[in-house]
């Protein structure tokens, strides 16, 4: 035995989303998950946000493989965009493999052969790491915890999990396997923190199935139900509920079709009733229709957003219809979703969420389930992941109350030594966020996004100056504010503002007026003063200086004479 066993999160710590974790021994590495997250108001105009893999890209020849715990976007979504930077085998079970093959193909990545399909419970070796995927229940089929044997001891990486005694799709959590792995205690438990602040248990999908069937039977008009496209059990529940209520079920949204196809390929959804294509609805009465649509988080291009705003080519909602949100609001999406709810209500649609009716159970463990996992594993070290900072600290406090020796709360980029010796952060590696702009990856800290945020908050003012070769103004400055000031107020004072800018330029010396930088600074300062902009108002001021030579002026004059 030599070296150290270290754990390095590149994403997924201090946040919910973008999970990507590294385990290393002697500079040999395995990666667990490679997910993305979705942009918020801090990245205007952006959609997908991916992790910066610079640290491991520089060591790609020492990266032994990627292990995927399950097929949620925050765990696999970055693979189609970043796998080519790594080029190593991807190890996962059947359903994640089916989803990944489709995602890689859709993104033009012809490397599906890189996927190694693993069987839960069967160990495989990657250098000094003996790995075994162990089935756990989650809100998606074929989810797994990762059991890792190392020369320094055992580590259990839980992934996303819960204890559901009656899962509707897929198998129960492999309690026997977990108990066996933790029988002698483990070195470290790296565990899901999402619901650590919620007492009790997370509930069973079977209970939601009964509730949704009853709810859909009661509805009179057209029903639109949205949920996470990857929640295969919920999709099956919704389809069965609609079918039993005498409704034709219509599936709308590319990601939902992709997930259903992958589930069928993997042997799930055997009880799925027949569904209609949205183009084949024909003369089916509205009260006999149920649309199963994407967009449970208010995604701008998803089906529900287009339906709510009347932009969908085939689906229209009317007063008396019902929209059921069979999902939880992901933190950060509240404002977008409330706006979506309001838009639906304005159309006369009844909106039903988990606050109104029992339509959702979480796919993550609540406190009682987390405590049970600690009893099975009896870890020396607890490393909280998959949660915001408040979740991580609550998880660490819980672990300490349960007798764990140490429960460090770390940040993305921290290199945490797990063994040998005392647990400590021994260094920090490069982390960050990349934004997918069309087909290009842009650093989230780029000026592009600072400029967009400033434009959103403060607007812009464009000034065009036309000067002759001596620096004299040939025309009055043309000033165009966009979103920076109230337009009527500006119009009332435009002549005075223009005059003050002209005066400021004329006060420059003969030498200064020939220096574009000096002219631009003078105009910026003068404009702020002339418009009375407060210090906190910082519009982007774009000064365009056009200098015309005598030849250009003569040519312009000749052209005017010719036209006359």
Locate each region found by the language model:
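His/Asp/Glu-rich metal-coordinating catalytic cores
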Residues: 1-67, 72-283, 302-316, 335-338
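RNA-binding accessory domains that recognize and position tRNA/RNA substrates
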Residues: 1-6, 486, 516, 520
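Short, well-ordered strand-loop elements centered on a beta-strand within folded domains, enriched
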Residues: 7, 30-31, 157, 249, ...
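A glycine- and charged-residue-rich anion-binding loop/surface
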Residues: 13, 37-41, 45, 62-63, ...
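Short glycine-rich phosphate-binding loop at a beta-alpha junction
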Residues: 89, 383, 542-543
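Conserved hydrophobic residues forming the short capping helix/wall of the S-adenosyl-L-methionine
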Residues: 104, 399, 531
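Hard-cation-handling environments
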Residues: 197-326, 330-355, 359-512, 520-521, ...
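C-terminal tails and terminal domains of large nucleic-acid-associated
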Residues: 512-549
